[in-house]
Amino acid sequence: MGKMRVRFPTLVLVLGIVFLMAVSIGIAYGEKDVLKSHERPEEREQEEWQPRRQRPQSRREEREQEQEQGSPSYPRRQSGYERRQYHERSEQREEREQEQQQGSPSYSRRQRNPYHFSSQRFQTLYKNRNGKIRVLERFDQRTNRLENLQNYRIVEFQSKPNTLILPKHSDADYVLVVLNGRATITIVNPDRRQAYNLEYGDALRIPAGSTSYILNPDDNQKLRVVKLAIPINNPGYFYDFYPSSTKDQQSYFSGFSRNTLEATFNTRYEEIQRIILGNEDEQEYEEQRRGQEQSDQDEGVIVIVSKKQIQKLTKHAQSSSGKDKPSDSGPFNLRSNEPIYSNKYGNFYEITPDRNPQVQDLNISLTYIKINEGALLLPHYNSKAIYVVVVDEGEGNYELVGIRDQQRQQDEQEEKEEEVIRYSARLSEGDIFVIPAGYPISINASSNLRLLGFGINADENQRNFLAGSKDNVIRQLDRAVNELTFPGSAEDIERLIKNQQQSYFANGQPQQQQQQQSEKEGRRGRRGSSLPF
């Protein structure tokens, strides 16, 4: 019992010493952490970064990190959606600037313009030093208001002098128009081959499934062709099938099996590969021999053609029918007949389905409009046709009037209804815009403006002008109806309607601006006449 009494104080002493040691160790570690937290930021960041450098970040981790930081850690390529958003914001900014410059009040809701497609909205399909082929994005991608155009696409290709676009066929009907230079187009069918010479303003239909190739025989001018494509298999999508293999495109023969090819050509596969498909090893050797630069220039679907080959390809080609009755297969010129509307401010040419058998079954019309600098194509609308318009040359702007969706009106019953919407945009070469049926439109040319139009659902379409002395539907309203329709008196309405003596095209400057311009020129003339010399 005495021994237990002696050991108990000793045990308590030992436990106390252990407790003090534990507390001392905890304090020491705490001081170490405090010292570590006061290290230089560079050293701490470097220490924290070391483990991350052991493996590269994934694209997902990089995007998440950029979102957390608020800005990307390095410049990255914009996606197609981001580019579209950027262009839409640019167009909206241009519209606001345009309204401020014009100084006119806007009675329309502020909307982005889904009917205008800048030239930047084309997607390149093929490109090399000899030319390029590109296609406009689908019309219905931007708005469901253009759903009826989902099976129509715009294709453009450009090629340098003395070049050839290799033979191909497509699962789409084409209606093409030459907008610059000259072309020789050969269409091949099972029983015949026909070549046509096309010049500026000539149009031609290439039926779906027909093998064709396009030559630029000119020594100086570039060739520019715009095509309206109407896909057959899948609405809005079409494909080109090439018999030859290039760096841009595989031959459709390469899709068949070895046994099928040998049975088809009754020849060994090695021979077929050498003649048609091409041997990859030989192609690589040929590229090295000629040099990579020359290879990049010649390889592809657009190739250089010699003078001798051009003479053979153009020898038996037929030209446009001119003012004769259009044939079932040959080219026709959009300006071969007299314009349907014409005055000193512009000309309007049109080929309707009933006047040309090539576009009759497609229910398509073609228009070519020339608006002189400073002139205005008066407001009008189409009764049935939807027009896809290509800006061939020049600059200007247009105003398109639409109506707000009925669904939006229901959702906004408590708001003041502003049903009329004005879509406007500046136009430059290569732009595309759509004119829906029934939507009034006017086009103003700031320089000589040339427009090519494809009319969809064009049979029995009627163009109704809203101003001018001829074909003016407002002018045909009864006098009594005018009094009931407009706030002005019948006399005022009649005087206003008859005030515009021009038809179809007119001076784009308001009368007040014309008077101010005349007064400025008069004052300038008087000052000039008073000079001492």
Swiss-Prot record:
Glycans are attached at residues 363, 444. Keywords: Allergen, Glycoprotein, Seed storage protein, Signal, Storage protein. It comes from the Eukaryota. The keyword Amino-acid biosynthesis does not apply. Residues 115-273, 332-494 form the Cupin type-1 domain. The keyword Glycoprotein applies. Residues 1-30 form the signal peptide. Residues 37-123, 315-337, 503-533 are annotated as: Disordered. Residues 31-108 form a propeptide. Coiled coil: none annotated. Residues 37-51, 79-99 have a biased composition (Basic and acidic residues). One of its GO terms (molecular function) is nutrient reservoir activity. PANTHER family: OS03G0336100 PROTEIN-RELATED, VICILIN C72. Conglutin beta is characterized by a broad microheterogeneity with almost a continuum of polypeptides ranging in molecular mass from 15 to 72 KDa. Blad, the major 20 KDa polypeptide, may be considered as a stable, intermediary product of conglutin beta catabolism. The initial characterization of blad was made on a seed storage protein extract containing both conglutin beta 1 and 2. Seed storage protein. Accumulates during seed development and is hydrolyzed after germination to provide a carbon and nitrogen source for the developing seedling. Multimers. Give rise to a complex array of processed forms, due to a large number of processing sites and changes in glycosylation. Belongs to the 7S seed storage protein family. This is Conglutin beta 2. The lineage of its organism: Eukaryota, Viridiplantae, Streptophyta, Embryophyta, Tracheophyta.
